Amino acid sequence: MTKPQLSYFKVRALGQFPRVLLSYLSIDYDNNYIDKIDENIIDDLKYGQLPLYTDSNGFKLVQSMAISKYIASQHDFVGKTPEEKALVDETLAAVNIDVFTFIIRVFRGVEEKEKIQEIIIPRFFAKWNQILGEKKYLAGGNSYTLADLYVYVAYEYIGYVLPFAADLLYNGKFPHLDSLKEHFESNKGVAEYLKNRPITERKI
């Protein structure tokens, strides 16, 4: 059987969510790094954008969050009850629409970096830290879900893209987020992915 393939640029950005997910779930996949969108791949891109996920059965899917939910749903990683699944969706939307978009806007100079400290950290990261302290898992229940993975990726990513944010977030300031980070990075598949993840000039 053909291995699943994830195609994305040689940067972290939106490709980080499904890459970390596939690694965490120990799915053997082809991590296909793309230099540019050309005629060899454009016909497979419904909206002209990467990432592109090609499953082992030939099914193709674009949009990072849709890809992640599709993979997670195949491996019982989206919550067990309707309430847990709704909380997973709620968290994914907050990460993808609010936090991640804002990080990129600050990185590109569209938003003032002070807003990271004034809005993003107290409204989102502090709240997630609080929930993790109260419930251990962001969607409740008794196991990790895609919600936890998404918050981990955002927590790791913001310090990479915006170094000033690392001083505001890390070093014990949010211990439950630190524990979440430790959980995912101690996973064998994730650790291997992080070890071999390419370093590029485009810090995004």
Curated annotation (Swiss-Prot):
Residues 81-202 form the GST C-terminal domain. Its EC number is 2.5.1.18. Disulfide bonds: none annotated. Keywords: Acetylation, Transferase. It catalyses: RX + glutathione = an S-substituted glutathione + a halide anion + H(+). Glutathione binds at residues 8, 49-50, 63-64. GO terms for molecular function: glutathione transferase activity. GO terms for biological process: glutathione metabolic process; response to curcumin. Residues 2-79 form the GST N-terminal domain. The modification N-acetylthreonine is found at residue 2. PANTHER family: GLUTATHIONE S-TRANSFERASE. Belongs to the GST superfamily. Alpha family. Conjugation of reduced glutathione to a wide number of exogenous and endogenous hydrophobic electrophiles. This is Putative glutathione S-transferase alpha-3. It comes from Dictyostelium discoideum.
